[in-house]
């Protein structure tokens, strides 16, 4: 198995940049630990470590918007990865947008681009 340098991070978490494998669009940034890395390699589906829940997270386990791994790039220090994925279900972001990067800075202000592809309240329930 490919070993990453989890010891380099104080909390054992490494960044994972997630891109659409066809278009190259950046879909999200998430974090992985050793367990989520192993699960990703074992299953071929993106697994992350949820910092808010402090638990393993299979992308799409609640929404159905799973990420199938097509390619993985590892940086020169083995402490950051790029997951090139097939985004099943169109939306990668928990807000319902295709990408978590749906806001652009324009003249010092945040401007929302595009509309959500699903209603998060219907998928995840009210908080």
Swiss-Prot record:
Binding site for Zn(2+): 76, 93, 100
HAMAP family: HisI
This protein's name: Phosphoribosyl-AMP cyclohydrolase
Catalytic reactions of this protein: 1-(5-phospho-beta-D-ribosyl)-5'-AMP + H2O = 1-(5-phospho-beta-D-ribosyl)-5-[(5-phospho-beta-D-ribosylamino)methylideneamino]imidazole-4-carboxamide
Cofactor comment: Binds 1 Mg(2+) ion per subunit. Binds 1 zinc ion per subunit.
Gene3D superfamilies recorded: Phosphoribosyl-AMP cyclohydrolase (3.10.20.810)
GO biological process entries: L-histidine biosynthetic process
Organism expressing this protein natively: Desulfotalea psychrophila (strain LSv54 / DSM 12343)
Residue pairs linked by disulfide bridges in the UniProt entry: none
Cofactors: Mg(2+); Zn(2+)
Keyword flag Zinc: yes
Entry's EC annotation: 3.5.4.19
Keyword terms: Amino-acid biosynthesis, Cytoplasm, Histidine biosynthesis, Hydrolase, Magnesium, Metal-binding, Zinc
InterPro entries for this protein: PRA-CH, PRib_AMP_CycHydrolase_dom, PRib_AMP_CycHydrolase_sf
